[in-house]
């Protein structure tokens, strides 16, 4: 027996299968090209259903065994289109999205450096200004101390001149216009009025007996007047007098007072006149 050959396919059927395969390849290439050019776009929709005349004829397995291998290979290509795999993002896309961050970070770092530099400059200028002010204050403090020492020296010099003027003339000069004796100064240690007479009375010599008690010496009265005038002048000027000077001044005036010759003569006359009836002098 001779093997029976399958009937040759119809030419129109072979042409339709070839056209369908070409259409599927064209759609796949177009989808792949669109996906590469627009990666962010959604996945393309599957191709629409083809018209009935473009679809391949479904045959039974018995008929497929009898089909020519060349025709069957073309028919297998006409199967349902498979979606192409999504391409992985290439290295060219990452610099586009990541390139902005280095620029912004570098710009922010430059701004921070500029702000820090400006802050350091302001801080240094402020520190220099404070140092200059401290130097000026130190200079002013030294000048103030020098003026204060000079003022104290001038006060002592004025007090000495005032005491000598009172000793030579015995007149009190007029008070300055800016000094008021009715308002005593609390910040200065002015000697109390009661301290002067107590010192003079303690340092003065004992008065003589007899007629000398009735006639006090004129030198002591004049010295008391001068001392009181001196105290009034010092209190009026509002100046502090050195305690050593006052003690020396009072000591020089009262402790070493010389006796006058007329006082000794008066004492001898009194002793001569006051004699007892028996002719002997009265000794007190």
From Swiss-Prot:
Residues 102-165 form the bZIP domain. Keywords: DNA-binding, Nucleus, Transcription, Transcription regulation. Residues 26-40, 108-118, 193-222 have a biased composition (Low complexity). Residues 130-161 are annotated as: Leucine-zipper. InterPro entries: AP-1-like (IPR050936), bZIP (IPR004827), bZIP_sf (IPR046347). One of its GO terms (cellular component) is RNA polymerase II transcription regulator complex. Residues 103-126 are annotated as: Basic motif. Residues 1-10, 41-54 have a biased composition (Pro residues). The keyword Hydrolase does not apply. Gene3D superfamilies: 1.20.5.170. It is found in: Nucleus. GO terms for molecular function: DNA-binding transcription activator activity, RNA polymerase II-specific; transcription cis-regulatory region binding. Its main location: nucleus. Residues 1-121, 174-284 are annotated as: Disordered. Residues 57-67 have a biased composition (Polar residues). Belongs to the bZIP family. Putative transcription factor. This is Putative transcription factor kapC. It comes from Aspergillus oryzae (strain ATCC 42149 / RIB 40). The gene is kapC.
């Amino acid at each position: 027996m001779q093997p029976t050959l399958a009937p040759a396919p119809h030419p129109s059927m072979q042409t339709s299968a070839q056209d369908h395969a070409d259409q599927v390849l064209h759609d796949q290439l177009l989808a792949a090209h669109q996906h590469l050019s627009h990666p962010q776009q959604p996945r393309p929709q599957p191709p629409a259903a083809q018209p009935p005349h473009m679809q391949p004829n479904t045959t039974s397995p018995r008929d497929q065994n009898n089909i020519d291998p060349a025709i069957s290979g073309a028919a297998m290509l006409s199967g349902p289109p498979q979606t192409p795999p999504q391409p992985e993002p290439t290295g060219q896309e990452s610099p586009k999205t990541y390139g902005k961050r280095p620029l912004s970070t570098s710009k922010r770092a430059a701004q921070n450096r500029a702000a820090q530099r400006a802050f350091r400059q302001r801080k240094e200028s402020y520190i220099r200004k404070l140092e200059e002010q401290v130097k000026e204050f130190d200079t002013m403090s030294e000048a103030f101390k020098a003026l204060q020492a000079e003022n104290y020296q001038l006060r002592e010099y004025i007090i000495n001149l005032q005491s000598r003027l009172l000793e030579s003339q015995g007149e009190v000069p007029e008070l300055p216009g800016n000094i008021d004796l009715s308002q005593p100064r609390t910040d200065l240690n002015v000697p109390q009025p009661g301290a002067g007479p107590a010192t003079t009375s303690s340092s003065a010599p004992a008065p003589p007996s007899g007629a000398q008690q009735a006639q006090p010496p004129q030198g002591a009265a004049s010295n008391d007047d001068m001392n009181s005038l001196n105290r009034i002048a010092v209190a009026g000027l509002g100046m502090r007098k050195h305690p050593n000077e006052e003690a020396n001044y009072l000591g020089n005036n009262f402790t070493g007072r010389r006796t006058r010759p007329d006082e000794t003569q008066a004492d001898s006359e009194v002793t001569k006149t006051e004699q007892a009836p028996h002719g002997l002098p009265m000794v007190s």
